């Protein structure tokens, strides 16, 4: 019996389950020494007739071992890929890579990017080389924009004068401002908390020192006690706070002048008496609302070598802000304290627009508005409180809107 040589040395025959991408399934027989590429050709003959006419078709497909999800290498045999009998292989067409862009497309894309690119400094200079030079005074442009907080003080000074004249015509104004004056007497900031003062005196501290410590530490007993202990050996501990003694003297002088003026008013006509009394109340309110420098800031700045009057002026100009006051003292000292009491030009478009506003006109006849203006004039940090007040808030809002509108135009 004659047996072919290749069959004598042939490897083990494996039965493999082949699955195509279109869902077709069949059994393919191959020996262990068959290459993956030969197996793929056989599968393509079975699955797609005539597909081998294109020699590149074999390279466009791949076999995947389903169990291990491995792509089989064309150069290896079935044995080398560790394929077993009854294994499942997937015949899948390879994903065609996207074609490279043509040179024309690349050039068009680059050109588009260049067109969208912002010009650099050299390009701007080249494009504007033939244009006439135009110099702009940027400093002058910036200074034309006025700061609202700076202008607000001038506006308030002028509006207070207008409000005083309007309220002097109100027959009930004297009684209204007497009540306001009494409220200020009850709610004065300089008054020391009696409970806190008693706690410190019961600990053995002298009353004068305890009062000074409480004023310096915003009526906080623990901080005041700590300050008294730290400064117990300080020779200046009994020195009155800057401006405190002066304020007491001013209050006494004010009381004397008030008494004498009331005696003089008694000899006047009733209308003049009422007007003078109202003027006197205005003065009292102004004195009680006058600026009070932060004692800690005064001491800190005086320790730097500045005079007490200069320090108080600096804190008044800068709303009790110590750092800003220090910069003011070291700088050109603008604005000056005298400028703070100057009102806005009564003939200016801004002031005329404010006075023509109906909301402002109505608010100026309200005594509470005058008190609010006085308070904001001496304590600018209280502006937020009055902006949220239902009576004074609308007036302040209209003033702000008018200022912003005219400032932009």
Swiss-Prot record:
GO molecular function: polyubiquitin modification-dependent protein binding; proteasome binding
Pathway assigned in UniProt: Protein modification; protein ubiquitination
One family name in Pfam for this protein: UBL_UBAC1
GO cellular component term, pick one: Golgi apparatus
Domain Ubiquitin-like: 14-98
Gene3D superfamilies according to UniProt: 1.10.260.100, DNA helicase RuvA subunit, C-terminal domain
Domain annotation STI1: ranges: 357-396
Gene Ontology biological process terms from the UniProt entry: protein maturation; protein ubiquitination
Subcellular locations according to the entry: Cytoplasm
Record field: compositional bias (Low complexity): 245-268
Subunit structure: Component of the KPC complex composed of RNF123/KPC1 and UBAC1/KPC2. Interacts (via ubiquitin-like domain) with RNF123. Interacts (via ubiquitin-like and UBA domains) with the proteasome via its N-terminal domain.
Domain notes: The UBA domains recognize and bind polyubiquitinated proteins.
Protein name as it appears in the record: Ubiquitin-associated domain-containing protein 1
Protein's gene: Ubac1
């Amino acid at each position: 019996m004659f047996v072919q040589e290749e069959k004598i040395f042939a490897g083990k025959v494996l039965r493999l389950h082949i699955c195509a991408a279109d869902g077709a399934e069949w059994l393919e027989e191959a020996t262990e020494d068959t290459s993956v590429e030969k197996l793929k050709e056989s599968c393509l003959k079975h699955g797609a007739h005539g597909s081998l006419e294109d020699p590149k078709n074999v390279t466009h497909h791949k076999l995947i071992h389903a169990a291990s999800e491995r792509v089989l290498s064309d150069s290896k045999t079935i044995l080398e890929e560790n394929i077993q009998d009854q294994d499942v292989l997937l015949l899948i067409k390879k994903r065609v890579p996207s074609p490279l862009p043509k040179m024309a497309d690349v050039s068009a894309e680059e050109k588009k990017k260049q067109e969208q690119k912002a010009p650099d400094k050299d390009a701007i200079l080249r494009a504007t080389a033939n244009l006439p030079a135009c110099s702009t005074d940027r400093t002058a442009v910036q200074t034309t924009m006025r700061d609202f907080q700076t202008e607000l003080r001038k506006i308030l000074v002028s509006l207070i004068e207008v409000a005083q004249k309007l309220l002097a015509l109100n027959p009930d104004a004297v009684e209204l401002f007497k009540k306001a004056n009494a409220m200020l007497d009850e709610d004065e900031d300089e008054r020391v908390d009696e409970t806190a003062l008693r706690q410190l005196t019961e600990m053995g501290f002298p009353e004068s020192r305890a009062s000074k410590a409480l004023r310096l530490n915003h009526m906080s007993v623990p901080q005041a006690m700590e300050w008294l202990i730290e400064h117990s050996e300080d020779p200046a501990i009994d020195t009155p706070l800057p401006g405190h003694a002066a304020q007491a003297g001013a209050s006494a002088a004010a009381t004397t002048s008030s008494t004498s003026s009331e005696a003089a008013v008694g000899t006047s006509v009733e209308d003049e008496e009422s007007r003078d009394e109202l003027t006197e109340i205005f003065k009292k309110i102004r004195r009680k609302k006058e600026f009070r420098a932060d004692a800690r800031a005064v001491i800190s700045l005086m320790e730097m070598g500045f005079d007490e009057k200069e320090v108080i002026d600096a804190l008044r100009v800068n709303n009790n802000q110590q750092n800003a006051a220090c910069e003011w003292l070291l700088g050109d000292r603008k604005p000056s304290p005298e400028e703070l009491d100057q009102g806005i030009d009564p003939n200016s478009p801004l002031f005329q627009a404010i006075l023509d506003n109906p909301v402002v006109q109505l608010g100026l006849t309200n005594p509470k508005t005058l008190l609010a203006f006085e308070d904001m004039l001496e304590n600018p940090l209280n502006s937020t409180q009055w902006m949220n007040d239902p009576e004074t808030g609308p007036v302040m809002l209209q003033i702000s809107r008018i200022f912003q509108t005219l400032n932009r135009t």
